[in-house]
Amino acid sequence: MSNIVFLDVDGTLIELPASAAKAVDQARAHGHKVYICTGCSKAEILQRNLCDLDGMIGGNGAYVEDNNHVVMHQCLSKEDVKNIVDWCNERHIGFYLEANSGMYCNDYMLEQGPETMVKYAKGKGASLENAKSSAQHFIDGFIHLQGDELYRDDVNKISFILRTYQDHLDSKVDFPHLVANTWGGKGEVALFGDLGPTGITKRHAIEVLLDYLHADAKDTISFGDAKIDLSMFECCAYNVAMGNGGFEIKEAADYITDDVNEDGLYNAFKYLKLI
């Protein structure tokens, strides 16, 4: 029996170990389909040295692609983007617009981003040296825009640095019609907030993809490491939490594997007889 596997097992900055790429390659060779299911948008994914996949779900479910074919794409309205950009700038908050065409940031992101990204990478298990290198690589990937240039109509979601958790709570109050989440480092410490279109979740995106593939949810397996991945767990038949994941995702999992940097993905693929 072939399975459809959805992966969101690591952070934005942390490269998957060689064993993970090996596991994905072997699973696909055995007839299984493997998709990345991530908060990142396509431009961010393309910057990374990932193995071959059958497709991707990006922007926490805003974008669905199968073998280079766009199955679904739902962006924020230009009006919402303008309002969020102005909201962040008024608060002197660093942010970046996540689009398939690129990652577009404001002045404050260039100032505040490196320190926050180092915290993020260290929380995901990177050494200080690697965290600094990864953070700089990530910042270098931004396209710096100013003023009206940031009012775009191709944005999947917007991530912004949290000065305190209150920034996230304020975003929920000020943008009640949008989906507000947080993401961060070890133990899901909230370093960033994000805002995306309403109705968009990883679960919804998986259901759209399964319908497109004429596939059955009983053949699905998901891998997650954070609270945002709980919606994947709601619709997939079997769910795996990474050892470096947060408490809530582990509580909801059918199986907990090792940390991603300790061959957790490869070990779980073997356990599930995908390879």
Task: List PLM regions with ranges.
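Mg2+-dependent phosphoryl-transfer enzymes with acidic/Ser/Thr/Gly-rich catalytic loops
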Residues: 2-4, 192-275
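Asp-based phosphoryl-transfer active-site loop
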Residues: 2-16, 84, 233
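Active-site metal-binding loops of divalent metal-dependent hydrolases
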Residues: 11, 61, 224-226
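Active-site phosphate-binding/coordination module
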Residues: 16-123
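Short, structured coil segments at secondary-structure junctions
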Residues: 51-52, 60, 174-177, 235-236, ...
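Short hydrophobic/aromatic-enriched beta-strand-loop microsegments
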Residues: 54-61, 180-183, 239-243, 257-258
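Conserved acidic, metal-coordinating active-site core of Asp-based
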Residues: 102-221
